[in-house]
Amino acid sequence: MTVLINEVSKYFSKQTGTVQVLENINFQLEKGDFVTVIGPSGCGKSTLLKIVAGLDNDFEGEIIIDGERITKPSKKQGFIFQEHRLFPWLTVEENIAADLSLKDKYVKDKVKEWVEIVRLDGFEKSYPKEISGGMSQRVAIARALLRDPSVLLLDEPFGALDAFTRSHLQEVLLNIWEQKKTTMIFVTHDIDEAIYLSNRIVIMSAKPGKIHKVIENNLPYPRSKTSESFQEIRKKVLQQFEHGGLIQTSI
């Protein structure tokens, strides 16, 4: 077992009182799982991801990764935000290395490996302002995976990108997953993206956020979004939104 989300609930305090954001979230991921999380805006998807990342420890319940209770960020979790958050004064390879020294041969070799995996060969010495948004997200992916985390957490990482770039980065991410079998939790608003990438789809309901349904996705890779089997799963997901009353809010 890689990740256990056990009885997780979350509350926010406001002037009008206490608001429950998450209610009794229970979920387990095995090593190599690729899970996508979808649901209405405000259902707590990103909040849950931050809790798993150790970025928010004010919650009820527990997060266990590789048998260890998580209370803060560690090398067990890699996190990718919607914005790439690169350091503008560092080059591509320096951003991937982050706080590690490129003078260390092991680090330099690992950076070189990830530059090749995310297809940034020739841009190692470039600065963030000199590369595109899609390339910047590839740098962020490589940086998050450099330390071989137990789980990679992605919070709508392709949401701000154009359709072509998003499609390209989906292929890059799947290639990484197939090579490394890193456990991944990917939050998205895009149903097609959720089906295309993952082997399990977690559908959340809102107010408070809870798991409404988990759909197994056994479509073989590579996948075609126009195939009959893909459309069948899409129909199944949409039915959950309609029958569960989740379609009232934008997804």
Curated annotation (Swiss-Prot):
Part of the ABC transporter complex SsuABC involved in aliphatic sulfonates import. Responsible for energy coupling to the transport system. It comes from Bacillus thuringiensis (strain Al Hakam). The keyword Zinc does not apply. It catalyses: ATP + H2O + aliphatic sulfonate-[sulfonate-binding protein]Side 1 = ADP + phosphate + aliphatic sulfonateSide 2 + [sulfonate-binding protein]Side 1. It is an enzyme of class 7 (translocase). The complex is composed of two ATP-binding proteins (SsuB), two transmembrane proteins (SsuC) and a solute-binding protein (SsuA). Keywords: ATP-binding, Cell membrane, Membrane, Nucleotide-binding, Translocase, Transport. It is a peripheral membrane protein. Its EC number is 7.6.2.14. InterPro entries: AAA+_ATPase (IPR003593), ABC_transporter-like_ATP-bd (IPR003439), ABC_transporter-like_CS (IPR017871), ABC_transporter_ATP-bind (IPR050166), P-loop_NTPase (IPR027417). One of its GO terms (cellular component) is plasma membrane. It holds the Pfam family ABC_tran. This is Aliphatic sulfonates import ATP-binding protein SsuB. The keyword Glycosyltransferase does not apply. It is found in: Cell membrane. One of its GO terms (molecular function) is ATP binding. Residues 3-231 form the ABC transporter domain. Belongs to the ABC transporter superfamily. Aliphatic sulfonates importer (TC 3.A.1.17.2) family. ATP binds at residues 39-46.
